[in-house]
């Protein structure tokens, strides 16, 4: 078993950081005259940050303007349409309900039909995968099985006929 005295000595090198400077922001009043500068980064923004601001501010401002115009148009339209809706509500509400129910019924019927077609398609594909054959192959297989069955029945009929003939001859011999 190896002990600490059996091993060769290792050398360890220790490097002290001479180029890194750690700034710890101080709280309160700075008497050295640094003031607020100690809280700011030592270098300015990168080029990509400047481009992002130059592109983002006009784009964001334009989108904010468009959303404000959209909100203003909605409020004006609602202010104009509210008296019309109030006046025609006995006609509009039943018409909207009827149209809504009709559209819902048509969409439901279409969804049920589509679901049925998808289910039928899935079943056909599943059956094809289980059997591994197509319809013409299945028909050929059925024809072969029918021919084999006809040969089998014919052979059995011949065998039965021969057995009957043999028994008849045995009976004839035994009676004579």
From Swiss-Prot:
It comes from the Eukaryota. The chain crosses the membrane at residues 50-80, 95-117. It is a multi-pass membrane protein. Residues 157-176 are annotated as: Disordered. GO terms for biological process: lipid storage; response to freezing; seed oilbody biogenesis. One of its GO terms (cellular component) is monolayer-surrounded lipid storage body. Expressed in seeds (at protein level). Not expressed in leaves. Its main location: other. Belongs to the oleosin family. May have a structural role to stabilize the lipid body during desiccation of the seed by preventing coalescence of the oil. Probably interacts with both lipid and phospholipid moieties of lipid bodies. May also provide recognition signals for specific lipase anchorage in lipolysis during seedling growth. This is Oleosin Ara h 14.0101. It comes from Arachis hypogaea. The lineage of its organism: Eukaryota, Viridiplantae, Streptophyta, Embryophyta, Tracheophyta.
